[in-house]
Structures are given as structure tokens and as C-alpha cells.
UniProtKB/Swiss-Prot annotation:
<dbReference type="InterPro" id="IPR019801">
    <property type="entry name" value="Glyco_hydro_35_CS"/>
</dbReference>
<feature type="signal peptide">
    <location>
        <begin position="1"/>
        <end position="32"/>
    </location>
</feature>
<comment type="similarity">
    <text>Belongs to the glycosyl hydrolase 35 family.</text>
</comment>
<dbReference type="InterPro" id="IPR048912">
    <property type="entry name" value="BetaGal1-like_ABD1"/>
</dbReference>
<keyword id="KW-0326">Glycosidase</keyword>
<dbReference type="InterPro" id="IPR017853">
    <property type="entry name" value="Glycoside_hydrolase_SF"/>
</dbReference>
<dbReference type="InterPro" id="IPR048913">
    <property type="entry name" value="BetaGal_gal-bd"/>
</dbReference>
<dbReference type="Pfam" id="PF21467">
    <property type="entry name" value="BetaGal_gal-bd"/>
</dbReference>
<protein>
    <recommendedName>
        <fullName>Beta-galactosidase-1-like protein 2</fullName>
        <ecNumber>3.2.1.-</ecNumber>
    </recommendedName>
</protein>
<dbReference type="InterPro" id="IPR001944">
    <property type="entry name" value="Glycoside_Hdrlase_35"/>
</dbReference>
<keyword id="KW-0964">Secreted</keyword>
<keyword id="KW-0732">Signal</keyword>
<keyword id="KW-0378">Hydrolase</keyword>
<dbReference type="InterPro" id="IPR031330">
    <property type="entry name" value="Gly_Hdrlase_35_cat"/>
</dbReference>
<dbReference type="Pfam" id="PF21317">
    <property type="entry name" value="BetaGal_ABD_1"/>
</dbReference>
<dbReference type="GO" id="GO:0005576">
    <property type="term" value="C:extracellular region"/>
</dbReference>
<feature type="active site" description="Nucleophile">
    <location>
        <position position="277"/>
    </location>
</feature>
Length: 636
């Protein structure tokens, strides 16, 4: 057989090389062949508009979308949730991108594990879903500071969501990194991304007319070539419009549907209509009720939107969980922090189970497309485990010695400006302030969000938004004054996001005299924080407990680890960690009564459970296979 070489067979070799290149390009495109008919695969026109219709290549395309946030769902369950979205008859996935989680410190990016955005998008494509990406930089999404990193607030003059130089400089560096990851996943490059949203609901903020054109240009300059969209509620719709960007609307009630045909038509003429967020339920706040939206009402409204010829995205299709401390808050008349569960009364439950909404909408979407949707995946197994009684204990005051050395400062320093985490401040968790006092009197100060006040180791009350003063009783000699301040969640929506600094804000006063000389401990409750506690540091639970305190126990799991929900009857307020995973906050004010524990985070055999309790502990932690999210309240 002859020995082939470039020298001896240049024509043949060149032909083979061209064939290989062509094969690579075809195979690259065929990775997405489940998304559209094969005869469209050679096209590169992408999503565009033609009169009242979306056109994908040469075909009219109605977007039937659903929102799932990869950062609120364990990675091991991404496939299950996306298959359920596809099986509901939907053709498009939408997701936000949280800047604060992807860049926890300036220039330090994290797209690994549960934050692997590229893997999530590629998985959606393999399952047969288009993707609409919503990269912000602000995303709202009931997440801390609307997804903006807290280190931005180190600048005392910071003006978020404007063309203020300190903000735009940070946005550009973040977009440089983010867009390098997502640009290759656009449709015209062979990927599933058919559209990208410019910021989020800016019409309701509208502090800088140059800002939205700036964000549009920032996206385009970094290679975004697919259709651009804006997203606003009906009140902010007109103010959120950007030249060359398709406006879409967010709504819930059938009474708001008129805006589809009136406001949208008036601001952009005959263009495709899309409800970018049809709110399938609502989020919950601590101290409130569990909000629900009747499935029949959901079906009626979605049917009306479809009948109108509009495209739609279900927000949320699957809400998931605010694991850790990522929940946001609202602050209009009162400050209200969001609960750990982001169940949202969505189409799938927090744990990914089917609902009446799913059954009804699957039938509707199957009728719309004329093609029976694929069969739904089986339910994820649930399990009730034996109750767990903590065996070991470590009071916060004894734990301090194992923490990093405190910051010393003449005056209090807010959380974001603490010289920790390589100069990026502290984003989440608690801060402990400590100073010495020599007299009694009235203690006052600005505490954000909730501060438990101690004399030595004895709790004497709380300071928060409503309680700004507390009486210090008469003491002999000097006393150590301690305030444990919790960041309960930065506001994610509204005009006051610039003022979301946490901890002690400004001076702390005793009898109107500023206190000095503080020790400040950062209690961010990360995995690294908890790893400081060796087994030798723990002790058997004593008869007389001192709070706050950490409790250590073991959850025994059989051969097949499965999802469960932890119920903390008798416990008051704190955080639960299982095998290093922060499940989130619990609080007996409700409405949420159980914490979701994914089975994929459990090991066969013994599982390590740590509870940080602020006030009073129960005797055990129970497991149940049914979530308890509180008393239902129908959304008006």
C-alpha cells in the first residue's frame, strides 16, 4: 500500500483535509439536531422578527419557555428538571446569571460545580431546548442585591445600575469573562442561545437614561449577536425601551393582558408579543404566609396568552432553593427578607415534583404544538429518616478562639468594608462586634439587619429596623458588650439598593456617646469556616446551655440516599449544614417549616449535621417526606 504524504499526494491530501473540516463543522452543528428539523441545520439566520411573528430560520416560531435557575438546583438534578420542562411541551429554557456568585471577589471567577453555566446550557441543548440567557448584570430574581456583588458597596459613592464609572468598570471586567464563555454557545455559532436579555426591569428603576444603551453596547462589543430583549412590568415598560431591542412584558393577572396589545403596540409597533415573565406563583417572606396561585387561574391566563398569539415564559417553571444565604429581600414600608425555599408555587415543586399546574399546562402545550410531548420522568424518591438528636455542642463564645483573628477598629466597620477575603469584605452570614463598656444606659445604633445584644455572654435583647434602642442594665465595673449582627438578605428590588450595607452602620452609641475600640469577627459560615472546628473542640451537650451555639449530630442513611425535608420543632432561628452544604436558614416565625435536603448531598451511612442556633435548641431534628411551607395565602 502506498505511503501517503503531503509531498506525494498534495491534491488528495488537501481534499481529505477539506472533507475532515467539513465533517467537523457538520457534526458540530448536529450536536443541536434535536432542536430543529435537520433540513434547517445549515442555516445561520437565528431568531428574528417578521411583523407579529418570531422567525427561526424560515419558520414561524412561538417561544414556549420556562425558567429554571441552575444556581438554585443541585447539579445532579439539572437533567431531571430540564427533562420535565421538555416533557411539559416547552421548547425554551430561560435562566438568570448571578454575578455575585460567579465573581465573589474582584477578578476571582467561579463557574465550577453548581455554577457551571456552560454545562447547564449545553445540557439544555442536548435535551432539545433553546435558551434565552438573562445575564444582567442586575437580575432581581429574589437574590441578594439582585445578583450584584456586595464588594461594589465598598465604594461610598457607588451608584448601582448607572453609568457611574466605579460600576461600569466592574461590569466590563465581569462581562469580559462571562461573554467569553457564552458567545460560543449562541445559535449562529452552533449553540442553543437564541436571545439575550439586556439588564432586567430597568423601567422600574430608570435612574440613568444612558445606562441601558451602555449595557446593550457592552453585550454587542463582546460578541453577542443574537436577538436582544428587554423585560419590564406594565408600569415600567415604556421607560425600559431601548432602540434596536425588542420589548417584552412581565405580568400575572388576566387584567394585565391588555398591556400586551396596547402598551407594547404603542411603543414598538407591530412586533412579536412576548410575556417574558408570566408569574406562576410568588415568593414568600419570613413572618408571612405561603403564597399560592390557583392552577385553574394559571391555565386560564396562559391559555389567553397563547390564544393571543404571544410567546410566553413561565417564571418560575421550577424555583428550587435559596441554599446558603443567597436570598434577597424587599423594603418598602417594612423590611421583609425572603425565606430559604424558592418553591414559588411553581409548575414543579421545590423538590422537582409534579403539580396540578404541570398536568394542566402539559395538556395545553401539547395541543398548541400539535405534537405529543415526551413522557415525563419518574418522580425523585423521597425518604423519612430516623430523627437525629445532636450529641455534641460548641458555644459561639468558645468557638471564637478557633476563628480568624478579629479585625480591630476604633469604630464599627460594616460587613462589606471589613478587611477580609482578600480585601473584598464579607458578603453573607453574621458579624460579631465586641467592645467594653463601664456604665449602664441606652444603647442605640443603626443595625442591619438584626442584632442580638449581649452583656458578656448573656442576651438582653435585639436591635433591628424597628427597635433602634435598648436599655443596658446597671453593671459593676467593666462589661464586654457584644452584638451579633445577621445579614438577612440585601434588597433585590427597588430604588434603595445603593444603601444595602450590612452590619453596624456608623457609630454605636451609649447614652448618645459613641463607643470606641471594637473587635470584629467575620462569621461567614462557609465550608472553610466550619472546617476550623476539630472534633476535639466539641463537648458533650451540658445541662445548662449558652447561646448562640453550634450543635453536631449524625443523620443515618440507608443504602439508597433519597431526598428528604428537615423539620426543626423546638428550635428557634439559625442555619443547618449537612456534609458541608448550607441548606439555608430556618426561623420559627414561619411560614416555612421544613428545609429541603437533596438526596444527592447525602452519603450512605453517617452524615454530618451542624446546626447554628441563635436562641434556643430543640431536642431533635426530624425528617419528613412532605414539605411544610406554611399556611397558604391565595395571591390577589
Amino acid at each position: 500500500m502506498p505511503k501517503w504524504s503531503l509531498r506525494r499526494r498534495p491534491g488528495r491530501t488537501l481534499g481529505l483535509l477539506l472533507l475532515l473540516v467539513l465533517s467537523f463543522l457538520v457534526l458540530r452543528r448536529l450536536n443541536w439536531s434535536t432542536l430543529v428539523p435537520l433540513w434547517l441545520q445549515h442555516q445561520r439566520l437565528g431568531l428574528r422578527t417578521k411583523g407579529p411573528d418570531f422567525i427561526l430560520e424560515d419558520s414561524i416560531f412561538q417561544i414556549l419557555g420556562g425558567s429554571i435557575h441552575y444556581f438554585r438546583v443541585p447539579r445532579e438534578y439539572w437533567r431531571d428538571r430540564l427533562l420535565k420542562l421538555k416533557a411539559c411541551g416547552l421548547n425554551t429554557l430561560t435562566t438568570y446569571v448571578p454575578w455575585n456568585l460567579h465573581e465573589p471577589e474582584r477578578g476571582k471567577f467561579d463557574f465550577s460545580g453548581n455554577l457551571d453555566l456552560e454545562a447547564f446550557i449545553q445540557l439544555a441543548a442536548k435535551i432539545g431546548l433553546w435558551v434565552i440567557l438573562r445575564p444582567g448584570p442586575y437580575i432581581c430574581s429574589e437574590i441578594d442585591l439582585g445578583g450584584l456583588p456586595s464588594w461594589l458597596l465598598q465604594d461610598p459613592d457607588m451608584k448601582l445600575r448607572t453609568t457611574y464609572h466605579g460600576f461600569t468598570k466592574a461590569v466590563e471586567l465581569y462581562f469580559d469573562h462571562l461573554m467569553s464563555r457564552v458567545v460560543p454557545l449562541q445559535y449562529k455559532h452552533g449553540g442553543p442561545i437564541i436571545a439575550v436579555q439586556v439588564e432586567n426591569e430597568y423601567g422600574s428603576y430608570n435612574k440613568d437614561r444612558a445606562y441601558m444603551p451602555y449595557i446593550k453596547k457592552a453585550l454587542e462589543d463582546r460578541g453577542i449577536i443574537e436577538m436582544l430583549l428587554t423585560s419590564d412590568n406594565k408600569d415600567g415598560l415604556e421607560k425600559g425601551v431601548v432602540d434596536g431591542v425588542l420589548a417584552t412584558i412581565n405580568l400575572q393577572s388576566q387584567q394585565e393582558l391588555m398591556a400586551l396589545n396596547t402598551v407594547l403596540l404603542s411603543i414598538q409597533g407591530i412586533q412579536p408579543k412576548m410575556v417574558m415573565e408570566y408569574w406562576t406563583g410568588w415568593f414568600d417572606s419570613w413572618g408571612g404566609s405561603h403564597n399560592i396561585l390557583d392552577s385553574s387561574e394559571v391555565l386560564q391566563t396562559v391559555s389567553a396568552i397563547i390564544k393571543d398569539g404571544s410567546s410566553i415564559n413561565l417564571y418560575m417553571f421550577h424555583g428550587g432553593t435559596n441554599f446558603g444565604f443567597i436570598n434577597g429581600a424587599m423594603h418598602f414600608n417594612d423590611y421583609k427578607a425572603d425565606v430559604t425555599s424558592y418553591d414559588y408555587d411553581a409548575i414543579l415543586t421545590e423538590a422537582g415534583d409534579y403539580t396540578a399546574k404541570y398536568t394542566k399546562l402539559r395538556e395545553l402545550f401539547g395541543t398548541v404544538s400539535g405534537i405529543p410531548p415526551p413522557p415525563p420522568p419518574e418522580l425523585t424518591a423521597k425518604m423519612v429518616y430516623e430523627p437525629m438528636s445532636p450529641a455534641l455542642y460548641l458555644s459561639l463564645w468558645d468557638a471564637i478562639q478557633y476563628m480568624d483573628k478579629p479585625v480591630t477598629s476604633e469604630t464599627p466597620i460594616n460587613m462589606e468594608n471589613l478587611p477580609v477575603n482578600n480585601g473584598n469584605g464579607q458578603a453573607f452570614g453574621y458579624v460579631l462586634y465586641e467592645t467594653t463598656i463601664f456604665s449602664s444606659g441606652v444603647l442605640s445604633g443603626l443595625v442591619r439587619d438584626r442584632g442580638q445584644v449581649f452583656l458578656n455572654r448573656v442576651s438582653i435583647g435585639f436591635l433591628d429596623y424597628k427597635t433602634t434602642k435598648i436599655t443596658i442594665p446597671l453593671t459593676q465595673g467593666y462589661t464586654i458588650l457584644r452584638i451579633l449582627v445577621e445579614n438577612r438578605g440585601r434588597v433585590n428590588y427597588g430604588n434603595n439598593i445603593d444603601s444595602q450595607r450590612k452590619g453596624l452602620i456608623g457609630n454605636l452609641y451609649l447614652n448618645n456617646k459613641a463607643l470606641k475600640n471594637f473587635k470584629i469577627y467575620s462569621l461567614d459560615m462557609t465550608k472553610q469556616f466550619l472546617q476550623r472546628f476539630d472534633m476535639d473542640n466539641w463537648s458533650v451537650i451540658p445541662k445548662e446551655l449558652t447561646f448562640p451555639a453550634f450543635f453536631l449530630g449524625a443523620l443515618s442513611v440507608g443504602i439508597y440516599p433519597s431526598d428528604t425535608f428537615l423539620k426543626l420543632e423546638g428550635w428557634v432561628k439559625g442555619v443547618v449544614f449537612v456534609n458541608g452544604h448550607n441548606l439555608g436558614r430556618y426561623w420559627n416565625v414561619g411560614p416555612q417549616e421544613t428545609l429541603y435536603l437533596p438526596g444527592v448531598w447525602l452519603d450512605k451511612g453517617i452524615n454530618k449535621v451542624i446546626i447554628f442556633e441563635e436562641t434556643m435548641s430543640g431536642s431533635m431534628v426530624q425528617s419528613t417526606d412532605i414539605p411544610h411551607l406554611g399556611r397558604n395565602q391565595y395571591i390577589n
